[in-house]
């Protein structure tokens, strides 16, 4: 016998399937009829518009005064050099929002993306071509790299950087493609429930799972404006009292993460037992764990990234608060 519903059915399952390093399929279900597309469409928009990426915003080239100049011994005109630089995908190491990176190359040689890697930045597009110089050329330049969202034209950047820099159109978005499908599914003999299936592809600056988490976090943040009036902070996630799926993931024990003995022992000696404890820590706090070496830190950071919780990201406040309460209960 059917029952009268007082609230919409709440989805309970999330599945993540890695298709490649830069592509993933994320499914959530079951939604009541019409609810899947209601959430899927804005999430797609947010993924494409609000994911944080990194881009070169300006370059200063020794011997070049403007973008229409040319350099003796360099095959490319400065304009082509700037276009090539714009197409190289960088990652800033650490928490900095902006870095200025300096380079100097002697010819003859081809300069590619991989040649721009140093302690401050990594490069995703390692094979991307930047310039070809001959033996007469010493190419010296500095690049301003900035984290951001969306797009900023060079005209706006010109007012921000110094007059000796050539501004560059900044395409920050790390998400290359997002598509979603709404599939019908059967729940307790009712065929009118839905599954939202996303396919997310990034350029390698961030993982698809991280991009998806950021989009969900932005949606939470935008909706929080209503909390000023309606006090939604104590609204229950489900009438059954079940924990959110994300919270269940965050209370996985660290000894179930398949870390090396060295990394596990460092965390264990620090009293860390659950994944969520690491996720709540800042990058500096993780690095400062006693007896945690660089190799162990890199392993832990890679593990957190693969799980969709990179060390430089923060949880939505409602999830973080619920996680702290849960951890207190588990460690009591």
Curated annotation (Swiss-Prot):
Residues 248-332 are annotated as: Alpha C-terminal domain (alpha-CTD). Transmembrane segments: none annotated. Pfam families: RNA_pol_A_bac, RNA_pol_A_CTD, RNA_pol_L. GO terms for molecular function: DNA binding; DNA-directed RNA polymerase activity; protein dimerization activity. Its EC number is 2.7.7.6. One of its GO terms (cellular component) is cytoplasm. It catalyses: RNA(n) + a ribonucleoside 5'-triphosphate = RNA(n+1) + diphosphate. CDD domains: RNAP_alpha_NTD (cd06928). One of its GO terms (biological process) is DNA-templated transcription. Gene3D superfamilies: 5' to 3' exonuclease, C-terminal subdomain, DNA-directed RNA polymerase, insert domain, RNA polymerase, RBP11-like subunit. InterPro entries: DNA-dir_RNA_pol_insert (IPR011262), DNA-dir_RNA_pol_RpoA/D/Rpb3 (IPR011263), DNA-dir_RpoA (IPR011773), RBP11-like (IPR036603), RNAP_asu_C (IPR011260), RNApol_insert_sf (IPR036643). Keywords: DNA-directed RNA polymerase, Nucleotidyltransferase, Transcription, Transferase. Signal peptide: none annotated. Residues 1-227 are annotated as: Alpha N-terminal domain (alpha-NTD). Homodimer. The RNAP catalytic core consists of 2 alpha, 1 beta, 1 beta' and 1 omega subunit. When a sigma factor is associated with the core the holoenzyme is formed, which can initiate transcription. Belongs to the RNA polymerase alpha chain family. DNA-dependent RNA polymerase catalyzes the transcription of DNA into RNA using the four ribonucleoside triphosphates as substrates. The N-terminal domain is essential for RNAP assembly and basal transcription, whereas the C-terminal domain is involved in interaction with transcriptional regulators and with upstream promoter elements. This is DNA-directed RNA polymerase subunit alpha. It comes from Aliarcobacter butzleri (strain RM4018). The lineage of its organism: Bacteria, Pseudomonadati, Campylobacterota, Epsilonproteobacteria, Campylobacterales. The gene is rpoA.
